[in-house]
Amino acid sequence: MDDLRVIVGAATDAGAVREQNEDALYVADPMVDPVPDNGLLLALADGMGGYQRGEVASQLAIETLREVYYAEPVGPTDIPQRLKRAFRTANERIFAGGSAAGEENMMGTTLVAAAIRGVDLTVANLGDSRSYLVPAKRAT
């Protein structure tokens, strides 16, 4: 079997409507992350602009995802459940943070993540942010 080669690029933009960029990105560095055997974790959270603190929600989602995913080693069949637990924990923390600050400070975000371990890819998604798998021969 050929080795898997992953090339990652990441960028965000506030767009034409918003003044503030409410996106948060995470691209794991397997050489630095606490459990490198868990593979490569990639994530994007897009804070919801209709709320006051979308940028806080997106950053909290990314931080929680990283914390929960790398909390301990995972086996290849454990990755979907680990991502599910990370998403649920992020949701609970975001809801609690918004609720504690009062209704005028509610916050929300989308979250999409990909975990690559060996030649296996697991994608998790919450909200309307999308992920695309682009084969090397089709990338332009």
Task: Describe each PLM feature range.
Residues 1-140:
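PP2C/PPM-type serine/threonine phosphatase catalytic domain
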